[in-house]
């Protein structure tokens, strides 16, 4: 089955601008991956399309209201006739990692909620959210950038999105290691040469050099 990712946001055009390009954009057009960006304002009953209000107990800023978010979520549930795995992009969430991206790839439907303003009414989070994810210990204007990172990292792992599985299984972080140094033409640039052990080989003989200290010496010896 093709994975479907739904993103609930106040700025769907911002998300589409990124997810409509490059590998993810091509995968969407080829039917290898579904991504739908929903404007939360489309699900409010307020005639001014308002989706926020002042928090009880005081405090600065505004909070996103429950109903527009819940209505958007319910609409997606009806579209897919199932309950998606719901992620809320939050500074309180678990740090995102390649391992979590690999695990999320197993879901058929993912719904990502992007917060804004001072956050989201806790009640709707308690009602629909399965997990909260953070990109790190810093503050962003909204959850959109985080949602784009998650959608890209998970989406590129789906079958058929990349040309070959080796494209991502040998990448940095996939197996807990960093990717090996790589080189292309010209053979000399700013006085720096491509390692002779690589430049002297025919293309069909070039293999990767491990970054794992335990196997680095073995791989270099094989290249010599």
Label each PLM-derived region with a short phrase.
Residues 1-77:
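N-terminal nucleotide/polyanion-binding subdomain common to many enzyme families
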Residues 4, 104-106, 198-201:
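Short, conserved loop/helix-junction motifs that constitute active-site signature segments
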Residues 6-8, 36-38, 87, 110-111, ...:
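Hydrophobic/aromatic beta-strand patches that form the interior of the parallel beta-sheet core
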Residues 11, 115, 212:
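Active-site glycine-centered loops adjacent to acidic/histidine catalytic or metal-binding residues
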Residues 65-116:
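S-adenosyl-L-methionine/SAH cofactor-binding core of RNA-modifying enzymes
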Residues 120, 124-171:
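Structured adenosyl-cofactor binding patch, chiefly the S-adenosyl-L-methionine
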Residues 145, 157-196:
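Internal, active-site/partner-interface "lid" segment
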Residues 198-224:
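Rossmann-like S-adenosyl-L-methionine
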